[in-house]
């Protein structure tokens, strides 16, 4: 996915989350292990969000076990370097031209 399309999908996802009552804490958090697209908080739960965009197939298929391992390592790094004492979950935000869908608490 091009950088422009990826940024637009993340912008849409961030706006959607804010409308749903989430506070956006960070976007594009990088570590040597990988990147978290959006880190948000709602009701004292941290949400580590992976945003996927697709025009012609189900975007969830692009979250592989390898990608999940990178996300988990990056989350662990984030939690070590930031003072948060709350529960967390990994969410997928699937963006298509017609829809935004959140799949909460994903695993692989």
Regions found by a protein language model. Give the residues of each.
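Active-site metal-binding core of divalent-cation-utilizing nuclease and nuclease-like domains
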Residues: 23-43, 98
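A generic structural signal for short beta-strands and their flanking turns/coil linkers
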Residues: 32-34, 47, 86-88
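Short, conserved glycine- and acidic-residue-centered signature motifs
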Residues: 6, 10, 63-68
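Short, well-ordered amphipathic alpha-helical segments that serve as non-catalytic structural scaffolds
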Residues: 74-75
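Conserved catalytic cores of phosphodiester-cleaving nucleases, focusing on short active-site segments
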Residues: 36-59, 71
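Catalytic phosphate/metal-binding cores of nucleic-acid and nucleotide-processing enzymes, i.e., regions
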Residues: 18, 61, 78-80
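Acidic-basic catalytic patches of nuclease active cores, encompassing PD-(D/E)XK
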Residues: 1-27
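Domain-level recognition of nuclease-like catalytic cores that cleave nucleotide substrates
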Residues: 82, 86-108
């Amino acid at each position: 996915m091009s950088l422009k399309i990826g940024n637009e999908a993340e912008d849409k996802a961030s706006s959607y989350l804010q409308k749903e009552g989430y506070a956006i804490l960070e976007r594009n958090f990088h570590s040597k292990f990988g990147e978290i697209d959006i880190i948000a908080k709602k009701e004292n739960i941290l949400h580590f969000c992976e945003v996927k965009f697709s025009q012609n197939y189900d975007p969830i298929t692009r979250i592989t076990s390898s990608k999940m391992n990178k996300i988990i390592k990056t989350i662990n790094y984030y939690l070590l370097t930031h003072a948060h004492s709350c529960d967390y979950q990994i969410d997928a935000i699937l963006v298509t031209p017609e829809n935004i869908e959140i799949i909460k608490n994903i695993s692989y």
